[in-house]
Amino acid sequence: MRPNFLVIMTDQERYPPPYESEAVAAFRRTLAGHERLRDGGAHGAVELHRHYAASTACVPSRTSLFTGHYPSLHGAAQTDGLAKSAGDPRVSWLDPSTVPTMGDWFRAAGYRTEYRGKWHISHADLFATGTHESLRTVDRKGTVDAVAVDAYRRTSRLEPWGFAGWIGREPHGAYLGDTGLVRDPLFAQQADELFADLRDEERPWLSVISLVNPHDIAFSTLQDNFGFPVPDDAVPEVDAAPSQADALDDRPQVQQQFHDVWPQMLIPQPTDATYRRFYYWLHALADRAITTVLDALDAHGHGDDTIVVFTSDHGEMLGAHGGLQQKWYQAYDESIHVPFVVRGPGIAPAPAGVDIATSHVDVLPTLLGLAGIDETIAATVVGEDHVEVHPLVGRDLSALLRGETTVDAVDAPVYFMADDDISRGDRQRNLLTGEPYEAVAGPARVESVLARIASGPGGAPELWKLTRYFTELGEDGDWPEEWELHNLARDPEERTNLAAHPGSDPVPELHQMQAVLDLTRDRKRLTPRFTPRG
């Protein structure tokens, strides 16, 4: 009998950084939902400690996770909001007839597939007739509009992307009713209702519960207006990242530019103690919803036959690396290193977890493997109504999770790419004041590779990260590419760029990692079969 699957996602939750204090670590251990995910209960649980987003920010990351491919293939490379509306010509959403989603793959194998919560892969909102105004289901106070909810249920807006049951609108933007504070408890309630309905389901099922927080960090300066000040005793003091004091003048130039333009795009948000404590309090808010979801899963009798997967779409800089915020224009661990836990029947207990680098593009092939779904056979089915069905570029880690193979047998380089230029669009004006601002210039595209190479004592393997900043041919300006190279084993905070030492010979690992990047890019950065002809 095939297992059920529950995918729980948060938004903007980073993996704990190496400089986290014991007080903050102790606070995180009080988050009951997160602890239950890692514990596994009556079954095994595995935490993959070096898991990375495949892209940033929200739209490209989520689309990569749910398709198993990179933006170079699925095309959803830009995040709407701020400079871009959903209809901006620079924004390309996932077309439902091109690259199939996780829902499509599992439906092809006979699964029932459901989605609740933040989607942000296509613009799936219902609209008031004759307007561009999305149909809201919740007001600022959290009061639910039952008629609007019914409209979303009847129209099942995610059916073309392989999922049923989604209730909009998308929780995205600076409206209080779209914050995690308001929406996450409602998404947890929707999960409870879904699990009750699934008790009579004869088919195996895959359900996604996608939460908003800690994404509300984007509105930290508005927290009093929105009604969620941090309780005095809820979160300990959170120290600044050591790299917050670093200068940006020797970093890739796009970082200094984004550091300067971000306050002009939304609202100045000082990277102070209040800001940092607010971010961790948002973890606690998300954890309440996770706890409700897990309680409901058990209460409705699904706990023993459901594999639970937990991750986040991307992380948050929180002032690290010279005061950077959010997740754009770089590939530092604060931004792309995220939690990833798998627990449930058939998962071998691994109290110490797994330390090889893994990626969001590994998730889909791994879940197919855990379900016993043959990718080749399923590809034939999804290929009947999708024109861009390609072999999945990620690894199937199911044998590792079942304890049937070793980490060395599945270790491989991890690729990351980001073309998301959040500062550029048709409405380059401050979201609150309307004041115009200039978009960042220079090499704003980013690609990165993580790989273990034999650089340690006695040839021991060490994890390295190489990041390239570049522009594409035909883009504005003639900008030279820029590089960052970090030995994560010896420099886990990424403060010493081994690729930038003018006047001296480059370290030998630079050329090694550049070769790894070229090879990994060729294997994983696929492009569509169907492209415009000149």
Language model regions located:
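Active-site-proximal N-terminal segment of extracellular/periplasmic enzymes that hydrolyze or transfer
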Residues: 1-46, 493-504
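Active-site-proximal cap/lid insertion segments
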Residues: 12-27, 198-203, 211-305, 309-358, ...
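Short, structured active-site-proximal loop/turn typified by the sulfatase FGly-forming signature C/S-X-P-X-R
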Residues: 19-63, 68-73, 112-113, 510, ...
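Polar, surface-exposed loop/tail segments
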Residues: 31-32, 58, 65, 118, ...
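Catalytic-site neighborhoods of secreted/periplasmic enzymes
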Residues: 43, 67-185, 197, 219-222
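Core domains of carbohydrate- and sulfate-ester-processing enzymes
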Residues: 61-62, 109, 123-170, 215-269, ...
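C-terminal, low-complexity/hydrophilic appendages and adjacent surface loops
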Residues: 121, 332-333, 417-499
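Catalytic-adjacent loop/helix segments of enzymes that bind and process anionic phosphate/sulfate esters
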Residues: 155-214, 270-271, 275-281, 285
